[in-house]
Amino acid sequence: MHRLDGKVALVTGCGGIGLGWGNGKAISVLLARQGASVFGVDLTHAAAETTCNLIREEGGTAQLHVADVTRAAQVRAMVETCMERFGRIDILINNVGRSEPGSPVDMTEETWNEQMDVNVKSAFLTCKSVLPIMEAQGGGSVVNISSVAGLRYAGKPQVAYAAGKAALMQLTQTTAVIYAARGVRLNCVVPGLMLTPLVERLADKYANGDFQGFVARRHKQVPMGRMGDAWDVANAVLFLASDESRYITAQQIVVDGGLTASTGL
C-alpha cells in the first residue's frame, strides 16, 4: 500500500536532462514511487521523456506531454489530454519557474513580463482549468513551488523573480481559502538554496561562470552549512499531495535549512 495509490498527478516542469536531479524530476519520480500515475509536462519533449522513462523503468505509470504553460490554449489542451488518458486529476504540481537578473532600472519590460508569465501566470492558468475538475471530483491537492526569494532578498538582483514568487504564494493562499469548503487544498513548497543542475546556469548568470565559488558561497549562507537538494523539495511535496496533510491548506512549507530565519545572506 502506497500513499498515493489510485491518484493521478499532473506535474508541470517535470523534465530533466542528463545527470542530476532537478526538482521536477525528483517530484515526479517520488510521486510515482508512492503509487500515483504521473502526467508529466515540460516545454521540451526530451526533458519530459527523460523523467517519464525513469518512472516507467521503475514500473510506474507516466505519460508525457509537451506544452508551454504560459499559453492558455496549450494549458487547456494539456488538461483535456490528461483527462482523456486518466479520467481524473487528484494532484496538480506547478513547478515551472525561471530567474533572470535585473533591477527595475536595468531590466527590460519584455523580461519583466516573461518572468511574470512563467512564475505566476502559468499557475493561474493551470488552476483555472484544473480546479473545476477537482471540485467536481470532491477534492484534490495543488502544490505550487515558490522560492525563498519571494519571502526576502535572496542575495541576487532578481526583482522580477522575487516579485513573481511572492505573487505565487499569495495566489495560492487566496485561492486556498476560496476553495477550502469545496474540498480542494492549495499549498506552497518554498525551497531555499538547492544544489540541482540549475545551479550551473545560475552561476553563469550571477557569478560570471564561477561554479565552484558560487556553490561554496551558497553552502556558507545556509545555517545548516549546506544547500539542500531536489529530494528535500520532493518529500515536502509528497506530504502536501497526500491525504496525510488533509487538514492543511493555504500554507507554506519552507525548505531552506534555516536560511530565511537567519541574517546570513
How would you name each of these model-derived features?
Residues 103-104, 111-113, 214, 218:
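Substrate-binding pocket helix/loop in short-chain dehydrogenase/reductase
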Residues 147:
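Residue(s) in the substrate-gating loop at a strand-loop-helix junction
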